[in-house]
């Protein structure tokens, strides 16, 4: 059997029932951890009907005594992930973050940008500390980002994690590995640190950072929005009080799209002879 992966999911074979000394009561199952030896899965995490010889998918991490332990709980993230986690308590060594399993995740002071506060949440990177062989979190996420993206194309869909607000817009983490940015004028919805959203590649810059948008790029997006706008007109007596001369902020507030996309959609509906266009409104053709 290959070496188990700490802080990650593993598929392990059930070896035997774990029995308490003295009364012989079962308190879980022992799983085959290969070179790591037998790994306990406590009784409360054992799926009903599990038998000796079965293979089970479990998350393996370290218990209070730094021994590998298996659980069927679903963590909020695993080793190699960036995540937005809440600080649950602190001591003289660092902070401890809730991440969906019984034992909280340790973030030492040296890995904090500023002292973490109980109840606040932070973007962190989860990794296995090579010196202590402990699962730890680091709030210095820029040290773990890959600034040499490869193969991205304009308009490609990606996964985004909102990292932090800046004067330019929002820093994001792209596909759990690269730094990116959504400019303020490209944000047409409420977003918050820790949000996970679908996004689209706008530009890959020379410095390796990626400019993203939250809307599909190009003509297809305008065509899709044209159908949304058409339905809006049908639902509102055939009138929309936004036209070519309307403010971009008013369009953004109403439809969560840019003025450019709105004008393309209006042009599409006009070419199809479905609307008439006025400076401050559009109307369905009756």
Residue ranges and their predicted role:
Residues 1-286:
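Single-stranded RNA-binding regions, centering on S1/OB-family and related RNA-binding modules
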């Amino acid at each position: 059997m290959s070496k188990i992966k700490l802080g990650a999911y593993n598929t392990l074979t059930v070896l035997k029932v774990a029995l308490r000394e003295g009364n012989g009561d079962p308190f879980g199952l022992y799983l085959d951890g290969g070179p790591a030896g037998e790994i306990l899965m406590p009784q409360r995490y054992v799926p009903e009907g599990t038998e000796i010889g079965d293979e089970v998918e479990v998350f393996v991490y370290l218990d209070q005594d730094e021994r590998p332990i298996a659980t069927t709980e679903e963590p909020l993230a695993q080793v190699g992930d960036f995540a937005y986690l809440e600080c649950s308590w602190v001591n003289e060594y660092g902070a401890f973050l809730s991440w969906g399993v019984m034992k909280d995740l340790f973030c030492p002071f040296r890995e904090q940008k500023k002292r973490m506060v109980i109840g606040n949440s932070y973007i962190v990177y989860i990794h296995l500390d090579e010196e202590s062989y402990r699962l730890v979190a680091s709030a210095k996420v820029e040290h773990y980002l890959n600034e040499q993206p490869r193969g991205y194309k304009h308009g490609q869909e990606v996964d985004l994690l909102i990292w932090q607000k800046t004067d330019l817009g929002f820093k994001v983490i792209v596909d759990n590995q690269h730094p990116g940015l959504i400019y303020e004028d490209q944000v047409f919805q409420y977003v918050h640190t820790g949000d996970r959203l679908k996004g689209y590649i706008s530009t890959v810059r020379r410095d390796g950072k990626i400019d993203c948008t939250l809307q599909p790029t190009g003509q297809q997006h305008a065509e899709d929005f044209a159908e949304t706008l058409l339905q809006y007109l049908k639902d509102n007596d055939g009138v929309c009080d936004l036209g070519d001369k309307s403010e971009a902020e008013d369009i953004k507030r109403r439809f969560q799209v840019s003025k450019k996309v709105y004008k393309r959609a209006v042009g599409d509906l006009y070419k199809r002879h479905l609307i008439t266009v006025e400076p401050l409104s559009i109307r369905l053709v009756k």
